[in-house]
């Protein structure tokens, strides 16, 4: 686990991204979720500062979110949230032992309920069958993400 960067450092990086032509800037953390309320508040301030001062859109991938957290991010100017389902539901228990597929879906529901765009995909090539690849794609279709990273 890495410490969260300072607001000014993230802002400088977003400004640089905009300067070289990026239209989007994504704030990403490691771990299952943001553990400390103060860290979450700091991320909200990052989003707000970038959106108020720059012309770049802000996205994030921070792990599991409650509805309240998703709404707070949206209220501070976040556009899109990335939360991958990773694989077909039937394969998921074999690739992840820290949480279940329903935990992933709960965050996705919260993201959509807050009015954020959803970025949701997964990884191909983890030993899944052709049927599991199809299952994964059909599951993604039902989630209606704005973009799908594979």
For each predicted feature, which ranges?
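Canonical radical SAM enzyme core domain
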Residues: 2-12, 34-80, 85-89, 103, ...
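Conserved C-terminal portion of the radical SAM core fold
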Residues: 27-29, 52-53, 80, 102-150
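Short alpha-helical scaffold segments that flank and stabilize functional sites
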Residues: 16-20, 86, 107-114
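Short Fe-S-cluster ligation motifs
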Residues: 9-29
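Short glycine-enriched, charge-decorated loop/helix-capping segments at active-site entrances
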Residues: 2-4, 94-99
């Amino acid at each position: 686990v890495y410490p969260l960067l300072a607001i000014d450092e993230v802002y400088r990086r977003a400004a640089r991204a905009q300067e070289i032509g990026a239209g989007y800037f994504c704030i990403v953390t490691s771990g299952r979720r943001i553990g400390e309320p103060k860290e979450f508040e700091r991320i909200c301030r990052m989003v707000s500062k970038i959106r108020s001062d720059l012309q770049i859109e802000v996205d994030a991938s921070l792990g599991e979110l409650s509805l309240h957290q998703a709404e707070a991010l949206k209220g501070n100017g976040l556009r899109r949230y990335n939360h991958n389902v990773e694989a077909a539901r039937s394969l998921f228990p074999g690739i992840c032992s820290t949480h279940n597929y329903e935990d992933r879906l709960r965050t996705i529901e919260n993201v959509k309920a807050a009015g954020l765009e959803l970025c949701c995909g997964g990884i191909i090539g983890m030993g899944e069958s052709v049927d599991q690849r199809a299952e994964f794609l059909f599951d993604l279709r039902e989630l209606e993400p704005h973009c799908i990273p594979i």
